[in-house]
Amino acid sequence: MSFSQESGAHHHPQDYAGLSDEEDEIDILGEDDPCSLKSHFYLQPTHSVMGDSEMLSPSKLSCTESESDSSGESEGGTSKDSSTTPTGSKAKRTLVKPPYSYIALITMAILQSPHKKLTLSGICDFISSKFPYYKDKFPAWQNSIRHNLSLNDCFIKIPREPGNPGKGNYWTLDPASEDMFDNGSFLRRRKRFKRHQQEFFKDGLMMYNSLPYYRPYSAIQPQPVLQQTSLTCMAIPETLPMSTHLAPYPDIKRKVSYPAQGVHRGFKAQDADNHPNNSQSKCSFSIENIMRKPKEPEPNIQSFNSHWNYNHVFQRPSSCLLPAVLNLSTGPLLANTQGARQYNLIQFPGCY
């Protein structure tokens, strides 16, 4: 028993001394490596040196082979991936979306153009050439540019000039939207630009002054409702009553005198027939003439209707147009007539 213990005690130091180099090599792989755990598991003091070496050799070889295989596979995999992956994919991963909105991109494109106007395709070409991110994703964002052009008031659509072939309309910036961005920086916009529809048109037909059917881009000037050239064609007879109040309709028939010249020639013929040129018919003071009511001549119906068409001047609301006509600057029609100066003093009730 003592010999076995001595022999065991004698052989144990040699075993550990002979395997010290192997243990150092195994520890280099890492303490958590499964091969190191196997080596520690096989290192038992009850076995001989040859048995230990024979038992350790397969495990060591298997570990080294597995390590070489694993390292070879990983190296081969990495080399294979590196060889198969193109250089463009790495560049695509590095592309970052620019921090500009679509409105800012469109504004950049329009401002850099010589004529300060571009078509949709021209805007897309500018964005693709300046920003590789949008060049890589070109078809996807073209509709977004189109929607921003149509929905934002800061962009104005300009039709193509006649004789200028091409596809699509031009787009430009509204002159009032120049201060849309803070201090000229396209990264931040102050507020959304809104155009007042009563002052400006949305789709500008106003950019070409040389063409007759376009008008210059400016605020709409209100046109006067009454024009002097059209009102001068309306002739007002000088024999209208000078009363300051409106008489009832039957009284107007009696008070309005017939014009000496004009369209009412039928009245003149009847007046000449019914009133002979003798003083007796005009001045008769007999009892019969006093008691008998003189018979009034019946005028021509056609001329009567045409004559009383002047009554629309005295009826409301058409009578309110008379002061506007008479208060105009004295034109050639009413300049030299005494009745025109008197009409200016007439006050028409109900006109306000």
Swiss-Prot record:
Keyword RNA-binding: no
Principal location: nucleus
SUPFAM superfamilies hit by this protein: Winged helix' DNA-binding domain
Acidic residues: bias regions: 20-32
Gene Ontology terms describing biological process: anatomical structure morphogenesis; cell differentiation; dorsal/ventral pattern formation; negative regulation of DNA-templated transcription; nervous system development; neural plate development; regulation of DNA-templated transcription; regulation of transcription by RNA polymerase II
Biased composition (Low complexity): 73-85
Annotated region of DNA binding: 97-191
Keywords on record: Developmental protein, Differentiation, DNA-binding, Neurogenesis, Nucleus, Repressor, Transcription, Transcription regulation
Pfam families noted in UniProt: Forkhead (PF00250)
GO molecular function, one term: DNA-binding transcription factor activity
GO annotation, cellular component aspect: nucleus
Subcellular localization: Nucleus
Ranges where the record places region Disordered: 1-32, 54-92
InterPro entries named among the record's database cross-references: Fork_head_dom, FOX_domain-containing, TF_fork_head_CS_1, TF_fork_head_CS_2, WH-like_DNA-bd_sf, WH_DNA-bd_sf
Expression sites by tissue: Maternal expression is localized to the animal hemisphere of the cleavage embryo. In pre-gastrula embryos, zygotic expression begins in the presumptive neural ectoderm. During gastrulation, expression is confined to the superficial layer of cells in the dorsal blastopore lip (Spemann organizer). Also expressed at a lower level in the paraxial mesoderm but not in the notochord. Expression is subsequently lost until after neural tube closure when expression re-initiates in the tailtip within the entire neural tube and paraxial mesoderm, but not in the notochord.
Factors inducing expression: Strongly by siamois, moderately by cer1 and weakly by wnt8 and nog.
Function: Transcriptional repressor with a role in dorsal axis formation and neural plate expansion; maintains an undifferentiated neural ectoderm after neural induction.
Name of the molecule in the record: Forkhead box protein D5-A
Organism field: Xenopus laevis
The organism's taxonomic lineage, starting at the top: Eukaryota, Metazoa, Chordata, Craniata, Vertebrata
Encoding gene per record: foxd5-a
